[in-house]
């Protein structure tokens, strides 16, 4: 299975409520993907991501200097207003063993534009090139609401209401996510914890760990 942790508050709700009940074997057998600041969130709950997608505004240099994450594949996105971040992280990126560079403009190898708009949907556009038929992909923190998770930015101490520009970006992200999830050969499933998520693709509401356990086992059985 593939588990993707995004920037919405639902990711933290899931981990706070159910992290201790998730069997270690599940984590060992799952590809864990962190979207930007979700890297810090996962590490807080002693989960090391296998892949990190970031435009570098949700993480700090010291987050990538932790030995535990340095075997991860790091997908770094460059766009018009993060050149200062690129320069700040350059000493770390030069030493990174598994680095993929992406851009919002035309591809110029080895830098690629694989599609997508926000960090969350951009990650899905890349991994969808490698998924298997009926492979389960769970999306946590893909809430698409009016709230931005506290782990989205290092300077956030709590969840914040999205401003108008962020809300617009989230709307585009939701539309792209819906389109990809609905057309993929894999089985994408947005996990809703607490707040209801409105999306034109598969959404599973989790009210307790048994709900998630049954969903996990059902997806595992159907994909085998």
Residue ranges of predicted features:
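Buried, small/hydrophobic-residue-enriched core segments of structured protein domains
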Residues: 87, 98, 129, 139-145, ...
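Short beta-strand segments
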Residues: 4-6, 36, 77, 102, ...
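N-terminal glycine-/serine-/threonine-rich phosphate-binding loop
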Residues: 1-40, 44, 50
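A structural signal for short, well-ordered beta-strand segments and their strand-loop junctions
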Residues: 101, 136-141, 189-193
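Acidic/Gly/His-enriched mid-domain segments of enzyme catalytic cores or analogous surface patches
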Residues: 30-31, 37-134
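N-terminal donor/sugar-recognition subdomains of glycan-related enzymes
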Residues: 1-21, 148-150, 155-224
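Active-site metal-binding loops of divalent metal-dependent hydrolases
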Residues: 7-9, 56, 142
């Amino acid at each position: 299975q593939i588990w993707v942790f995004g920037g919405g508050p639902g990711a933290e709700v899931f981990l706070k409520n159910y992290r201790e009940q998730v069997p270690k074997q599940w984590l060992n057998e799952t590809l864990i993907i962190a979207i930007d600041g979700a890297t810090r969130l996962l590490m807080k709950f002693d989960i090391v991501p296998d892949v990190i997608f970031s435009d570098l505004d949700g993480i700090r240099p010291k987050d990538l200097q932790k030995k535990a994450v340095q075997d991860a594949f790091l997908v770094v996105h460059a766009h018009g207003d993060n050149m200062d971040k690129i320069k700040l992280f350059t000493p770390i990126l030069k030493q990174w063993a598994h680095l993929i560079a992406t851009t919002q403009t035309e591809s110029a190898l080895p830098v690629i534009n694989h599609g997508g708009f926000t960090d969350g949907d951009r990650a899905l556009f890349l991994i969808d090139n490698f998924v298997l038929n009926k492979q389960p992909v769970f999306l946590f923190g893909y809430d698409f609401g009016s709230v931005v998770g506290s782990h989205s930015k290092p300077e956030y101490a709590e969840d914040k209401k999205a401003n108008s520009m962020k809300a617009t970006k989230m709307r585009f992200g939701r539309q792209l996510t819906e389109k990809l999830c609905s057309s993929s050969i894999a089985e994408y499933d947005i996990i809703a914890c607490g707040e209801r998520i409105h999306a034109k693709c598969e959404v599973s509401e989790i009210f307790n760990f048994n709900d998630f356990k049954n969903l996990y086992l059902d997806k595992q059985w159907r994909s085998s």
